[in-house]
Amino acid sequence: MCELLGMSANVPTDICFSFTGLVQRGGGTGPHKDGWGITFYEGKGCRTFKDPQPSFNSPIAKLVQDYPIKSCSVVAHIRQANRGEVALENTHPFTRELWGRNWTYAHNGQLTGYKSLETGNFRPVGETDSEKAFCWLLHKLTQRYPRTPGNMAAVFKYIASLADELRQKGVFNMLLSDGRYVMAYCSTNLHWITRRAPFGVATLLDQDVEIDFSSQTTPNDVVTVIATQPLTGNETWQKIMPGEWRLFCLGERVV
């Protein structure tokens, strides 16, 4: 099973601390050795780093850890392959344009019966069930909303109903972002935590690293981190129950 990591913040924030915990699970403290990827949004653009090599000893992962890219929305993934070979085209996250925005998606789980999903003009580049499901989601969205929708809360509610359908085909944990909103849909395991003032000290579970957030933030900062399993041991993470979803915007939970 793969692992997911997402972030939503009200000011551009670096995700180095959480990413450091995640990369250790990519072949170090965890079995997810079949590649990793991370997408940072910046304005309407986004930059993605991917590598089919294990993240815990990937030079590209080290670059991302050492180069604190600040963003308000981040989606990351480490892979334990089940559908599709270990290759760059099968490495999450996947990004496609819809309604003039970059939509980024990462999936944890395994689906059956996915090959019959109709994807319209959206065609997978790789062989994963994950990318096929993403193309299907986008196709369903363009069918329901031929023009750019105004009510994004309703759009994400519709996406959650589509995720319910995919969950019937197996395990479907998902992170999805259009750069402003970050959506988390849970099929088995997904947790989140919102950090705000007064900020304290956090300690990673997977590496002997501690950070005092009060020295890294201002009193107005709000940062939500979403992960498959909690990344820190001395904080209280919220578990999303199977079949439930959360929507975050600028660090705050909106659904």
Swiss-Prot record:
Name under which the protein is recorded: Putative glutamine amidotransferase YafJ
Keyword Transferase: yes
Glutamine amidotransferase type-2 domain span: 2-251
InterPro entries for this protein: EgtC-like, GATase_2_dom, Ntn_hydrolases_N
Single Gene Ontology MF annotation: transferase activity
Pfam families in the record: GATase_4 (PF13230)
Active site positions: 2 (for gatase activity)
EC number: 2.4.2.-
Alphabetically ordered keywords of this record: Glutamine amidotransferase, Transferase
Entry keyword Glycosyltransferase: no
Disulfide-bonded cysteines: none
